[in-house]
């Protein structure tokens, strides 16, 4: 795998002779190559909104509770599991609180983070909600996030992509 991606991280997508890595780049590539199934709104303001929501999750929440960071906490700093869960809970909760406020204030929100069709933001959100559940985050303060998650999970693409359904899914 390191021959494909020297970082040793997912996602990596191989499309013919092209090797794609990093979620933002892969999503942008999909948007350009498969325009009939857009994940971004048509208007510039809508695209900005979706990218901003995506960045809130992908840049401000996820990096603090990704597998590599958690393994470092456990293995190098000898942080016990209860403290790891506390760490994740804190950072996910803080990020979700800000995201929930954005979703409440956004008049364009429909069934998804933006509008009535899936966007980049939903692609970022749903795996993070899985992490939140795994790390015992109380989701009650985030009803919009919970509603979006529930709706997305009715779609086959989201169900198939669930992190806990993957062959390398962590046990804890």
Model-derived regions: residue spans:
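Short coil/turn segments at secondary-structure boundaries
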Residues: 66-67, 162-165
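GST-like domain detector, emphasizing the conserved glutathione-binding G-site
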Residues: 1-83
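Active-site-flanking alpha-helical
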Residues: 31, 128-129, 162
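GST-like fold's C-terminal all-alpha helical module
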Residues: 57-154
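Phosphate-coordinating loops and pocket residues in cytosolic domains that bind phosphorylated ligands
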Residues: 3, 154, 163
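Carbohydrate-binding/catalytic loop surfaces
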Residues: 119, 166-172
């Amino acid at each position: 795998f390191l021959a494909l991606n020297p970082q040793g991280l997912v996602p990596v997508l191989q499309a013919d002779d092209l090797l794609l890595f990093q979620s933002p780049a892969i999503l942008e590539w999909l948007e350009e190559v498969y325009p009939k199934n857009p994940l971004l709104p048509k208007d510039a303001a809508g695209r900005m909104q979706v990218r901003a929501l995506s960045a809130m999750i992908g840049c401000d929440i996820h990096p603090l509770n990704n597998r590599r960071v958690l393994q470092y906490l456990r293995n190098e700093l000898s942080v016990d599991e209860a403290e790891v869960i506390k760490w994740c809970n804190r950072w996910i909760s803080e990020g979700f609180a800000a995201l929930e406020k954005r979703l409440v204030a956004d008049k364009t929100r429909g069934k998804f983070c933006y509008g009535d069709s899936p966007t980049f933001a939903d692609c970022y959100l749903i795996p993070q909600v899985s992490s939140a559940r795994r790390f015992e985050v109380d989701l009650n303060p985030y009803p919009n996030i919970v509603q979006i998650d529930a709706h997305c999970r009715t779609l086959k693409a989201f169900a198939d992509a669930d992190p806990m359904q993957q062959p390398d899914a962590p046990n804890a």
